[in-house]
């Protein structure tokens, strides 16, 4: 942009640029032919509004997170999506740093919650090993324990964890005494 003009000049100033902002000159940034006197132009900066979108990847969200931001904002998402049996994290830790520009999309990333499995063998023992944890994605059938002098009857809770199950589980082994013959 020029730094001087004469009464014969007609000037339209080029808009200044600044990352994350739109600008306009006051007075329209123009000097008309025939103008006289010193001129001062001030740039009027307006932060560009960018869109924020969300991909919940099968989850749901209670509450709202921001849908727009500007270069002046620092955003931390406070509402995390939920999905049965999973915990979520957002891309980028759910943050937009001050000074960022451009539309943003946050994806929900899902990790299966790990639940505990506890056992009460009631004096029995297992030949092998039953799992001590599971997730909503697992399907488990327990190994039955043995107990000297007893037949294994059943596990409470059927000794199975169906795919889609959630929550910590405790299984107790049930036995029936072996009936022995006495011969005389």
Cite the ranges covered by each PLM segment.
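Secondary-structure capping and domain/repeat boundary segments
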Residues: 1-184
């Amino acid at each position: 942009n020029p730094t001087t003009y004469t009464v014969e000049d007609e000037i339209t100033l080029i808009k200044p640029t600044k990352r994350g902002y739109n600008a306009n000159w006051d007075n329209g940034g123009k000097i008309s032919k025939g103008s006289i006197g010193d001129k001062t132009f001030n740039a009027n900066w307006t932060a560009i509004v960018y869109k924020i979108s969300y991909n919940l990847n099968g989850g749901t969200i209670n509450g709202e997170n921001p849908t727009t931001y500007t270069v002046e904002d620092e955003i931390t998402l406070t509402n995390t999506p939920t999905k049965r049996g999973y915990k979520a994290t957002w891309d980028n830790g759910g943050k937009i740093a001050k000074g960022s520009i451009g539309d943003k999309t946050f994806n929900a990333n899902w990790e299966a919650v790990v639940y505990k499995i506890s056992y009460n063998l009631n004096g029995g023992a297992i030949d092998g090993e039953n799992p001590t944890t599971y997730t909503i994605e697992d399907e488990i059938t327990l190994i039955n324990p043995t107990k000297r002098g007893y037949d294994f009857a059943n596990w409470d809770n059927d000794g199975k964890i169906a795919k889609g199950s959630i929550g910590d589980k405790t299984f107790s082994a049930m036995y029936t005494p072996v009936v022995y013959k006495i011969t005389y």
